[in-house]
């Protein structure tokens, strides 16, 4: 009996160490950033069982077999659609400003399509204004409405949008709504999904959370885009979820969420529509390519039109493109660079690009919320402040609520707005969208918004920062070490 017990014990110990060795080897063989690999190895060797389970659940990018097959299957038809779109030469920009040219060329080479011109663009900073404009557009819709959001929180004006969407569906408008399962959990546990489906709206719960499949698909891979397309002519995107700030996370202690959205008219709606169609096919298996270019796209030739490029990320989309776009934008800056983000946990490359810009004389400012709804990210962000301040970067802490806007402005001419946070999750994991806009007029509008944010912020004093308590420094370094995993 003792011999059997001893044998089982030795086999268990051997299996335990073989499991650790196997996972270690898998981490080392995967092409990933060194800080990320080191952080995973530390967790696994300090808390082996917890670390191994965590790594198998969220350590690698698993879209899931069914979705991965759909992603592969959709590309031939998507590529053909893009080639057909290229025949509409009048919608594509032939040249860009000197500051935007490198980024637009990068996007064209990697996505197979140039930036589109002739778009009308309106920047919106008040949630009420966004929802009122959206309700008007829904009421005037003639053919189709597509929406995707990370969060749809019932209550307030979000319910008015839902009512207008159901009214549109009842009068024959084809309405599709895709919401992230985790972000919109309150919505899916409310009466709204059934009400909408009964009205004729196609409602899809994207990347459904299923603990039984935790090792088959990465559960923290989320659908983080916020997009609306109406009649393949009007489009919205930005940082705002479908929530009324007066009813959203009021007990979080961070104040109301401050967002930014862009309302657009023109060919950009078609460029965003193909992104939506890819997401829809990956999730449902149904192909809904936008109408052919000769039916959908009007010959916009206004001199006042904006040139815009869409940058999409996520499984099935060009790998690392949003990260490359941010690096390109930072290195293109000659006069000033202003970045706004709620979550700042950058890659080493992006941090280096930001600091290098400041060190070569560019006026660099980063605007972050003083209070954050994520304690982990809040502490991890602080770990980067010393290096930023030493390089000459101005760090502003916004005090008027949770600043949720994601924006970048380069030399007043190249603007980036969308859903991308400056953290690892947005850069390399989630389904995201960013608009790159090459236009001085829009740059001036964005600069005015950012100036307003700065006026409601406190500039971090480098001397006072260096005098912060020791316990804060220890906490920052601890969270910094695990920042590649956040």
From Swiss-Prot:
Coiled-coil spans in chain: none
GO molecular function list: cardiolipin synthase activity
Catalytic activity: 2 a 1,2-diacyl-sn-glycero-3-phospho-(1'-sn-glycerol) = a cardiolipin + glycerol
Keyword Ribosomal protein belongs to the record: no
Active site annotation, chain numbering: 224, 226, 231, 404, 406, 411
The keyword Secreted is assigned to this record: no
GO biological process: cardiolipin biosynthetic process
Known function: Catalyzes the reversible phosphatidyl group transfer from one phosphatidylglycerol molecule to another to form cardiolipin (CL) (diphosphatidylglycerol) and glycerol.
HAMAP family in UniProt: Cardiolipin_synth_ClsA
Protein name: Cardiolipin synthase A
Gene name in the database record: clsA
């Amino acid at each position: 009996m003792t011999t059997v017990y001893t044998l089982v014990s030795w086999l268990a110990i051997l299996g335990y160490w073989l499991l650790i060795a196997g996972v270690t080897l898998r981490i080392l063989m995967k092409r990933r950033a060194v800080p990320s690999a080191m952080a995973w190895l530390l967790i696994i060797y300090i808390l082996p069982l917890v670390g191994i389970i965590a790594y198998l659940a969220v350590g690698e990018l698993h879209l899931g077999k069914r979705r991965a097959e759909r992603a592969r299957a959709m590309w031939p038809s998507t590529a053909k659609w893009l080639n057909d779109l290229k025949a509409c030469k009048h919608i594509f920009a032939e040249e860009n400003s000197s500051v935007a040219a490198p980024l637009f060329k990068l996007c064209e080479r990697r996505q197979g399509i140039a930036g589109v011109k002739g778009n009308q663009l309106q920047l919106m900073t008040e949630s009420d204004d966004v929802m009122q404009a959206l309700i008007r557009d829904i009421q005037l819709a003639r053919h189709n409405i597509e929406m995707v959001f990370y969060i749809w929180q019932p209550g307030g004006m979000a319910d008015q949008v839902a009512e207008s969407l159901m009214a549109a569906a009842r009068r024959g408008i084809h309405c599709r709504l895709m919401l992230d399962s985790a972000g919109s959990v309150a919505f899916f546990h409310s009466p709204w999904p059934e009400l909408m489906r009964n009205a004729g709206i196609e409602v899809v719960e994207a990347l459904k959370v299923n603990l039984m499949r935790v090792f088959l698909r990465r559960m923290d891979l989320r659908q983080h885009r916020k997009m609306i397309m109406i009649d393949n002519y009007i489009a919205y995107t930005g940082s705002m979820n479908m929530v009324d700030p007066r009813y959203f996370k009021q007990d979080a202690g961070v104040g109301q969420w401050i967002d930014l959205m862009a309302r657009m008219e023109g060919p950009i709606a078609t460029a965003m529509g193909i992104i939506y169609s890819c997401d829809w096919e990956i999730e449902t298996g149904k192909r809904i390519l936008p109408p052919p270019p000769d039916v959908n796209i009007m010959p916009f030739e206004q001199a006042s039109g904006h040139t815009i490029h869409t940058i999409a990320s996520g499984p099935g989309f060009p790998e690392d493109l949003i990260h490359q776009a941010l690096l390109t934008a930072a290195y293109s800056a000659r006069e000033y660079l202003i970045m706004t983000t709620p979550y700042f946990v950058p890659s080493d490359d992006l941090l280096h690009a930001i600091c290098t810009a400041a060190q070569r004389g560019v006026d660099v400012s980063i605007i972050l919320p003083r209070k954050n709804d994520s304690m982990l990210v809040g502490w991890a962000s602080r770990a980067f402040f010393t290096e930023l301040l030493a390089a000459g970067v101005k760090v502003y802490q916004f005090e008027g609520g949770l600043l949720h806007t994601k924006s970048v402005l380069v030399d007043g001419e190249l603007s980036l707005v969308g859903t991308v946070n400056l953290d690892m999750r947005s850069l390399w994991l989630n389904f995201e969208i960013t608009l790159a806009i090459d236009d001085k007029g829009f740059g001036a509008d964005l600069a005015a918004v950012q100036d307003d944010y700065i006026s409601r912020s406190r500039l971090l004093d480098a001397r006072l920062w260096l005098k912060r308590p020791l316990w804060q420094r220890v906490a920052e370094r601890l969270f910094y070490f695990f920042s590649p995993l956040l």
